[in-house]
Amino acid sequence: MKIILTHEVSGLGTAGDVVDVKDGYARNYLVPRGFAIRWTKGGEKDVAQIRRARKIHEIATIEQANEIKAKLEGVKVRLAVRSGDAGRLFGSVTPADVAAAIKAAGGPDVDKRRVELGSPIKTLGGHQVSVRLHPEVAAKLGVEVVAA
């Protein structure tokens, strides 16, 4: 079945790509969750709109990505989160929390989908986080999680 991706799907492609997948995968997973729509001739207009929106948020060149990487690595990120006595958090730190903390610390605006946590952050202390700016460029930064 031909579908148009509306979001980035690991192993398939990015938003706006037209891909061919098995019928069950499309009907039972991708379409109900909003990751894709069925391909139609009218859907081609949607593809153009999705691609325009993607270009706005896309970092075009490696040079731009390296500039943003330099800015990111100079930012000290601290997150104040509620925690218990033993240093365990109530919940966990999400990529959206990290992206908001980067912005609050004076860093560049980063999309939460670009923030990659190695494993869920559920304890106080220092943690390593990477931000995938370009397929070839990733910024590594330290995030300090403190009790609120």
Curated annotation (Swiss-Prot):
One annotated GO biological process: translation
Secretion signal, residue range per the UniProt entry: none
GO cellular component terms given for this protein: ribonucleoprotein complex; ribosome
SUPFAM superfamilies assigned: L9 N-domain-like (SSF55658), Ribosomal protein L9 C-domain (SSF55653)
Tree of life domain: Bacteria
Molecular function in Gene Ontology: rRNA binding; structural constituent of ribosome
Annotated keywords: Ribonucleoprotein, Ribosomal protein, RNA-binding, rRNA-binding
Function noted in UniProt: Binds to the 23S rRNA.
PANTHER family in alphabetical order: 50S RIBOSOMAL PROTEIN L9
Family statement drawn from the similarity comment of this UniProt entry: Belongs to the bacterial ribosomal protein bL9 family.
Name this polypeptide is given: Large ribosomal subunit protein bL9
Name of the gene this protein is made from: rplI
